[in-house]
Amino acid sequence: MKTVLIGVGQAGGKLASALQSFDRQTGFGAVLDAVAVNTAKADLQSLPVETVLIGQDRVNGHGVGGDNELGAAVMESDQTEVMSALDGRVTAEAESIFVVAGLGGGSGSGGAPVLAKALAGVYDVPVYVLGILPGADEGALYQVNAGRSLKTVAREADAVLLVDNDAFRSAGESMSEGYDAINEAIARRVGLLLAAGEATEGVGESVVDTSEVINTLRSGGIAALGYASAEASPNAEDNINAVMSTTRRAVLTGTSLPDASDADAALVVIAGEPDTIPRKGVERARRWVEDETGSMQVRGGDFPLESGRLASLVLLGGVERSERVESFMERAREAIDKAETEPREDPKGMWHSDDLDDLL
């Protein structure tokens, strides 16, 4: 899937940069371009992508201090500047646009829904949001921001591919080390998904293409992405169990949103050398995902890739009923209840409701 990435806020800019870097290192060619947008000048300076500083008349390059209503207002007033930066970048070759944002910070949580809506009104391709949930220990402000942003962005984007920070954090890591590891892990997963049907080595029996990714996300709402890999045997028949076990791990323990196996649709992609991918294994994995998700809309296919390993990539669409999403929204509601002041109303009405019930 050919795409253009737009990172919003500090976390969004870093992850968009990591995705572009992964795509270039692998030679997939799925990421056509990447742009980072932020209200904090310092957070843009080290990024290896085109950058756009917004809100200079309001915050003078110092960021919005976690205020997502200010982040939304700044994006609303400066969106023309952002859209101008995309001229010549979102070409006819683009099959999608990904807005990448941390949903806990002010610029990302406030700006991403505004930008997604603006992009959808201009471009005739799906606009997805790759959103990062804050960890449970990241403070009440981040929980409130993310809860409101998730509810709003799910309405404005064609789908929200959600990443839970807590699913990737390892014990003993510093905060910066943890975020770097999360970015690398997500870049690998999303990079492989975007590359499906693009830069392939050899010819698979049933190669996944962009339309299958789009159809899996067509129902909208929240999506999750699972991944697992294992050593491959040279003989395809010997890899049936490997395909099954990696698919189970991808769904049960390797998703970007844990406990999200109840889905409206799914796509199972088995990546590896074409001669090592067992057709029976792919079909069995697809049927297992059908049973696990309760969905009859489960697609499956190959991603021919020069590698000594087999990987299972499972895209789950329509997972907003998952336990993890429900527990996060409850956490956000509790944070709102503890807030000492009522949030201000944003001038454009994007943040019209403090009620976090009924996500969609």
UniProtKB/Swiss-Prot annotation:
Cited InterPro entries: CetZ, CetZ_C, FtsZ/CetZ, Tubulin/FtsZ-like_C, Tubulin/FtsZ_GTPase_sf, Tubulin_FtsZ_GTPase
GO cellular component: cell division site; cytoplasm
A molecular function GO annotation: GTPase activity
Keyword match Cytoplasm: yes
Keyword Membrane: no
Domain of life, source organism: Archaea
Region (Disordered): 334-360
Composition-biased stretches (Basic and acidic residues): 334-354
Consequence of gene disruption: Does not affect motility. No differences in growth rate or cell size.
Main location: cytoplasm
Biological process (GO), any one: cell division
Keywords of the record: Cell shape, Cytoplasm, GTP-binding, Nucleotide-binding
Binding site residues for GTP: 10-14, 65-66, 106-108, 138, 165, 183
Gene3D superfamilies (alphabetical): Tubulin/FtsZ, C-terminal domain, Tubulin/FtsZ, GTPase domain
Pfam families per UniProt: CetZ_C, Tubulin
Compartmental location: Cytoplasm
UniProt similarity note: Belongs to the CetZ family.
Classification via HAMAP family: CetZ (MF_01946)
Function (record text): Involved in cell shape control.
Protein name: Tubulin-like protein CetZ2
Protein's organism: Haloferax volcanii (strain ATCC 29605 / DSM 3757 / JCM 8879 / NBRC 14742 / NCIMB 2012 / VKM B-1768 / DS2)
Organism lineage string: Archaea, Methanobacteriati, Methanobacteriota, Stenosarchaea group, Halobacteria
Gene responsible for this protein: cetZ2
